[in-house]
């Protein structure tokens, strides 16, 4: 970890440094809060990089599409994306290519997923441009650090307006039906993140 936070503020740090917890003492993030609320303090400690020496950030492959969509939309960064020329992951060659990409720290997606991904990101960009926030300026992936008493807290909103009056949070979903998305908000505890 390269970044160290020593006082409350807004910081520009890497994704990896944020998830390694750059605060002076173990800090509370939305991920830790979810575990505290759903399970227990002991479970939260096991999933905290400063409280568990054996902690490994195991990003689930089920979030790959959302992770890449965020990187493309927020930072115009495709460096972690590798497109695999295969119809699915069932062949030996596709599995080997997928595993090699993961070993390099990349996120592999299939060609058909790449087309869907680019359409998704394009739609989000069009929506932002044409919406009420289209004239505002935002900084992506800023790290916010503050203290509540003696407890350090941190957050990493997708977009923070430069005048600090608005935070936007980009979410991907399997079902755009409003009722289904409301259920997803509860299931994924999005209310703790935003």
Language-model region placement:
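Mg2+/Mn2+-dependent nuclease catalytic core
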Residues: 138-194
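Metal-dependent nuclease catalytic cores that hydrolyze phosphodiester bonds in DNA/RNA
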Residues: 1-155
């Amino acid at each position: 970890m390269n970044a160290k936070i020593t006082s409350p503020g807004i910081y520009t740090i890497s994704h990896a440094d944020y998830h390694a917890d750059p605060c002076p003492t173990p800090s509370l993030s939305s991920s830790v809060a979810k575990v505290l609320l759903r399970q227990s303090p002991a479970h939260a400690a096991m999933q905290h990089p400063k409280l568990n020496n054996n902690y490994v950030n195991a990003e689930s492959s089920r979030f790959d599409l959302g992770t890449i969509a965020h990187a493309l939309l927020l930072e115009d960064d495709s460096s972690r994306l590798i497109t695999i020329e295969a119809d699915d992951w069932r062949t030996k060659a596709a599995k080997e290519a997928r595993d090699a990409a993961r070993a390099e720290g990349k996120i592999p997606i299939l060609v058909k997923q790449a087309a869907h991904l680019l359409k998704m990101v394009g739609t989000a960009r069009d929506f932002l441009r044409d919406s009420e926030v289209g004239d505002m300026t935002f900084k992506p992936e800023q790290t916010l650090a503050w203290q509540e008493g003696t407890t350090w807290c941190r957050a990493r909103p997708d977009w923070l307006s430069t005048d600090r009056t608005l935070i936007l949070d980009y979410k991907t979903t399997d079902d755009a039906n409003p009722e289904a998305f409301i259920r997803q908000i509860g299931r994924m505890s999005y209310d703790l993140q935003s």
